[in-house]
Amino acid sequence: MKIYLVGGAVRDSLLNLPIKDKDFMVVGATPEQMQQLGYRQVGKDFPVFLHPKTQQEYALARTERKVGLGYGGFSCYASPDVTLEQDLLRRDLTINAIAQDEAGNLHDPFHGIADIEARQLRHVSAAFSEDPLRVLRVARFAARFHGLGFEIAPETMALMQHMSQTEELTALTPERVWQEVDKSLGGPHPEVFFEVLRQCGALKVLFPEIDALFGVPQPEKWHPEIDTGLHTMMVLAQSSSMTEEKAVRFAALVHDLGKALSPKEHWPKHHGHGQKGLPVIKSLCERLRVPNEYRDLALLVSDQHQNVHQAFELRSETIIKLFDKADFWRKPERLKQLLLACIADMRGRTGFEHQPYPQSDYLNACFLAANNVDVKAIIAAGFQGAQIKQALNSKRIEVVEQVKLNWQQSQAKQTP
């Protein structure tokens, strides 16, 4: 019986990255032997055991055979006669197929160390194409390690392109697809994840709403990058540089889906695209089982980002209606999220990457003033029932109007 540290822990150690989880592989043991040593079996589909003290996972060496569609269409064979190399052969990428024995020696039958040094994401064997989830995993690794200079090996990209043309991708469950998306949204370069999926052809299969944005033009005056798909990737990149909140990043990703619905004869204009995108976002979120928190913010950003951009032109009544509709009174954190997404939208354009966004300070000032209106004072003044709400609304409009005047005066003083 031999125990090896495998997978991400070995890879990340070689990359001098912090190690989050350790996975171990056991060669030459049976489930009965593991249980006699105090390990507790937890794996249903294949033998995985928890260490009696550390609770870390130890999996028996195994091989896999394709028996059906999808990432779950495999039968596993775990036996004491399965070798280290046979187990590593079933893994996705060479950089994930390196093992370390208990003496610290590295076992690298598929040259993963060389690929780490060359910054290459390369598949281990042709069996890579049997698991459609690997298309998403490689895209996620490309995004995760983009800052380290990793690229997908040409032969691996060719395999991913072939896989995207088969029915395998459609066999993936929404939960597994979203799991990979969510992990990518939490990484440093989520835009790379979607760029890779587009490059291999998986984007139009799994996320047709996003793929449809590429090739849709926007007015060059406001969007020097012109292409809506490119703009969307730039906005997503901007959002990830500003916040780690995955809900904001998701909202940035889908804020312009309505532009794909604009009639070609109206291009490059996209009137009402924010509202047109609402049913598209709802459909996408329902299909992928997107969490309600993400969906609700995405709908808000799509619906209101044009209003936020035009904040200085909005009447005070319209600003209060925006606050009411978004329920900022009970969820003030959503205003911050909305503004972050709008800043990302504004800066996600060629040449505008460092542009100031005074609309954010202005709307924050409006909300602070409106939220400080004292309801108790209104009640004390004798208002009752529905009159209280009307008086509160009028007072909020009044204080926002004052903020508006103060802002205009301060801007006038700054203008030479």
UniProtKB/Swiss-Prot annotation:
Gene Ontology terms describing biological process: RNA repair; tRNA 3'-terminal CCA addition
Chain ranges of the HD domain: 228-329
Keywords: ATP-binding, Hydrolase, Magnesium, Metal-binding, Multifunctional enzyme, Nickel, Nucleotide-binding, Nucleotidyltransferase, RNA repair, RNA-binding, Transferase, tRNA processing
Gene3D superfamilies membership: Beta Polymerase, domain 2, cca-adding enzyme, domain 2
Enzyme Commission (EC) number: 2.7.7.72, 3.1.3.-, 3.1.4.-
Sites where the protein binds CTP: 8, 11, 91, 137, 140
Keyword Nuclease: no
Requisite cofactors: Mg(2+); Ni(2+)
Binding, Mg(2+): 21, 23
Catalysed reaction equations from the record: a tRNA precursor + 2 CTP + ATP = a tRNA with a 3' CCA end + 3 diphosphate; a tRNA with a 3' CCA end + 2 CTP + ATP = a tRNA with a 3' CCACCA end + 3 diphosphate
Positions that bind ATP: 8, 11, 91, 137, 140
Single GO term (MF): phosphatase activity
SUPFAM superfamilies given in the database record: Nucleotidyltransferase (SSF81301), Poly A polymerase C-terminal region-like (SSF81891)
Co-factor binding details: Magnesium is required for nucleotidyltransferase activity.
Keyword Hydrolase: yes
Protein family: Belongs to the tRNA nucleotidyltransferase/poly(A) polymerase family. Bacterial CCA-adding enzyme type 1 subfamily.
More info: A single active site specifically recognizes both ATP and CTP and is responsible for their addition.
Function: Catalyzes the addition and repair of the essential 3'-terminal CCA sequence in tRNAs without using a nucleic acid template. Adds these three nucleotides in the order of C, C, and A to the tRNA nucleotide-73, using CTP and ATP as substrates and producing inorganic pyrophosphate. tRNA 3'-terminal CCA addition is required both for tRNA processing and repair. Also involved in tRNA surveillance by mediating tandem CCA addition to generate a CCACCA at the 3' terminus of unstable tRNAs. While stable tRNAs receive only 3'-terminal CCA, unstable tRNAs are marked with CCACCA and rapidly degraded.
Comment on protein domains: Comprises two domains: an N-terminal domain containing the nucleotidyltransferase activity and a C-terminal HD domain associated with both phosphodiesterase and phosphatase activities.
Subunit structure, interactors included: Monomer. Can also form homodimers and oligomers.
Protein name: Multifunctional CCA protein
Lineage of origin: Bacteria, Pseudomonadati, Pseudomonadota, Gammaproteobacteria, Alteromonadales
